[in-house]
UniProtKB/Swiss-Prot annotation:
One of its GO terms (biological process) is cell division. The gene is mraY. This is Phospho-N-acetylmuramoyl-pentapeptide-transferase. It comes from Delftia acidovorans (strain DSM 14801 / SPH-1). The keyword Nucleotide-binding does not apply. The chain crosses the membrane at residues 24-44, 76-96, 100-120, 137-157, 170-190, 193-213, 225-245, 262-282, 289-309, 314-334, 369-389. Pathway: Cell wall biogenesis; peptidoglycan biosynthesis. Its main location: membrane. Catalyzes the initial step of the lipid cycle reactions in the biosynthesis of the cell wall peptidoglycan: transfers peptidoglycan precursor phospho-MurNAc-pentapeptide from UDP-MurNAc-pentapeptide onto the lipid carrier undecaprenyl phosphate, yielding undecaprenyl-pyrophosphoryl-MurNAc-pentapeptide, known as lipid I.
Length: 392
């Protein structure tokens, strides 16, 4: 918005020439981060007071960690603060004509809405389970598939008109269409190794990445500050990848696919980092507010969508290794329990408790130890992911 305003003012008078600074992507990214940070810090106390007055407190499962019972009643749905900060800051500083940022915003707010309904049911109905898994998965699938269907053609073409033409061509060809190499699965650490996916393969993979990342972040969000800092780190790293793929010169030099317009996602990633830091101010142990599903589902989906756009799905799995392991720990725990119950008549557990962070708590780690150690691991994984920029 401010970019368009600055361009309009420059056209009116040469005296506004100093506003050309807003044309620089890096400048707008810095301003987006600062804007989101300030909005979050200023709005945070008011939101916490409002949630407290409305008695929107987090119910704690009776079969959960005993040490977490004291957290019962802590205001939840604080993820709304993150989404507000991201949305306002991004709308102020990004190029409004950029379709990639719009699709990420829509996916983020869509998954945020699902999370809001889930949190609201937990609070109003006093039901720790909230929205039933089937219903939640259905709406996640609807948004994920719509985003995937748009992105498969959006990444292949440079304008919405061309996207529509490619879609029509795909339908007329009997749903058989070869996509350009940049729409393939990019393998890190190798020079220009890209496996063709086809339209169906791209849609399925994108759907799995978006929905999977959303649920993985949600499962990780179980301790004070545990999820938000890895989200900040991974999001910031993806912003660097977005800057590279959006710049023809850097993309060619580093042997990355050039995705025109993807660089503008740096503004969104910066806003996410600023909003995340503001939220961490209030979410640090002992937390004054919890993110809730409204934040966790939305942030995870946004990371997945950005990774798809910049063609770094595998790198996302590397940098977000904590999210992956947390999700796998739950799936393995549930699968093993059901298998052993069916075979031996009594369910057995692989871990003391799932997700993995609760296993370490049961093993004697303090909550802050688990959180900070997971942060350190994520930082190292992000550095490994960023090394793929050059190690090819």
């Amino acid at each position: 918005m401010l970019l368009m305003l600055s361009q309009w003012l420059q056209g009116l008078s040469p005296e506004f020439g100093f506003l050309r600074v807003f044309q620089y992507l890096t400048m707008r990214a810095v301003m987006a981060a600062l804007t989101a940070l300030v909005i979050g810090l200023l709005a945070g106390p008011r939101l916490i007071r409002m949630l407290t007055s409305l008695k929107i407190g987090q119910p704690v499962r009776g079969y959960g960690m005993e040490t977490h019972l004291a957290k019962s009643g802590t205001p939840t749905m604080g993820g709304a603060l993150i989404l507000l900060s991201i949305a306002v800051s991004t709308l102020l500083w990004f190029d409004l004509s950029n379709r990639f940022v719009w699709i990420v915003l829509l996916v983020t707010l869509g998954f945020g809405t699902i999370g809001w309904v889930d949190d609201w049911r937990k609070v109003v109905n006093k039901d720790p389970e909230g929205m039933r898994s089937g219903e939640k998965y259905f709406w996640q699938s609807v948004i994920g598939l719509l985003a995937a269907l748009y992105l498969v053609f959006c990444i292949s073409e440079n304008s919405n008109a061309q996207v529509f033409e490619l879609f029509v061509t795909w339908v007329q060809s009997g749903f058989a269409l070869d996509l350009p190499p940049k729409a393939g699965l990019l393998v890190p650490f190798f020079k220009e190794v890209s496996y063709p996916l086809g339209v169906l393969g791209f849609v399925i993979m994108t759907y799995l990445v978006i929905v999977g990342a959303s649920n993985a972040v949600n499962l990780t969000d179980g301790l004070d500050g545990l999820a938000i800092m890895p989200v900040i780190m991974v999001g910031s790293a993806l912003g660097i990848f977005a800057y590279v793929t959006g710049n023809a010169g850097y993309a060619k030099y580093l042997l990355f696919p050039h995705i025109p317009g993807s660089g503008e996602l740096l503004v969104y990633c910066a806003a996410m980092a600023g909003a995340g830091l503001a939220f961490l101010w209030f979410n640090a142990h002992p937390a004054q507010v919890f993110m809730g599903d409204v934040g966790a589902l939305a942030l995870g989906a946004s990371l997945g969508t950005i990774a798809v756009i910049v063609r770094q799905e595998i790198v996302l799995a590397i940098m977000g290794g904590i999210f992956v392991v947390e999700a796998l720990s739950v799936m393995l725990q549930v699968t093993w329990f059901k298998f052993t119950k069916k075979r031996y008549g009594q369910g057995r557990r692989l871990l003391k408790m799932a997700p993995l962070h609760h296993h370490f708590e049961k093993s004697g780690w303090k909550e802050t130890q688990v959180v900070i150690r997971f942060w350190i691991i994520t930082m190292l994984l992000c550095l490994l992911g960023l090394s793929t920029l050059k190690l090819r």
